[in-house]
């Protein structure tokens, strides 16, 4: 399958540059792939029209690290880093700006005199070794929230709150699992009042989620691994919910990939604990969804693995016709944009 089949033209004016005024106030497009119907809601809070106590909602509670860092090169140039994964107390994978000019052995001066050296390099991806142990407080103090490059404005303090979910808990993501940004504490209270169960897994968002597909053929894309955690108690609740016939609603593609990677359809059990996945779901792969019944997600970038996953879940033609309708109706796209609820998969 050709990657360009997942391209679409989007007016720049529809790329959300700021979050909605309040969490939950974004618009919601609802897709029913089986009936081939599309519904429109003026607020994500209206999700209650489509779910009930027979729904079990599962979220990704990874917290975004302030992973955009700036350092001075030996030549005095300002170099930007995006910290990805911690692989040791003083070792991280990262992306580096002006990558063609940066070579193994280069040393950079970070805030507080911390020095970092490139140990290895693969295109713009590097392994960075600091001359001291680095804890999360350091990034919290000196880093910046890594808002995506299509948000073309200066860094704003609002991003420190709104690019993070209200339930984020474990630091490790280099980008937000943006589907969760729509859910307010009030909406969680409403779930509880309506006896709608929910729980959390943790998948740290990295290159596997946000790296674009650059190969001409979809099948040739190299999906990066991302780490995730499913606790025993969460797995038990999920398994019981499925056994009782409840619909499993995944909040975001990251959550879906973790669940689908870990679930054994024969044993009807999850593998629990720390794991990793490079699961790449796309139309034409004939992937059979084992566990997730419903998907809540954002409107994704062209030719992204996220758009391909949604296209596999709901049907490529139906998804692209819904995107066309969203554009015509002025929906906002990408991280701070509006949301989509897919009621079932094909």
Swiss-Prot record:
This is S-adenosylmethionine:tRNA ribosyltransferase-isomerase. Transfers and isomerizes the ribose moiety from AdoMet to the 7-aminomethyl group of 7-deazaguanine (preQ1-tRNA) to give epoxyqueuosine (oQ-tRNA). It is an enzyme of class 2 (transferase). It is found in: Cytoplasm. Transmembrane segments: none annotated. Its main location: cytoplasm. It catalyses: 7-aminomethyl-7-carbaguanosine(34) in tRNA + S-adenosyl-L-methionine = epoxyqueuosine(34) in tRNA + adenine + L-methionine + 2 H(+). Keywords: Cytoplasm, Queuosine biosynthesis, S-adenosyl-L-methionine, Transferase. Monomer. It holds the Pfam family Queuosine_synth. It comes from the Bacteria. GO terms for cellular component: cytoplasm. GO terms for biological process: queuosine biosynthetic process; tRNA wobble guanine modification. Belongs to the QueA family. GO terms for molecular function: S-adenosylmethionine:tRNA ribosyltransferase-isomerase activity. Its EC number is 2.4.99.17. Pathway: tRNA modification; tRNA-queuosine biosynthesis.
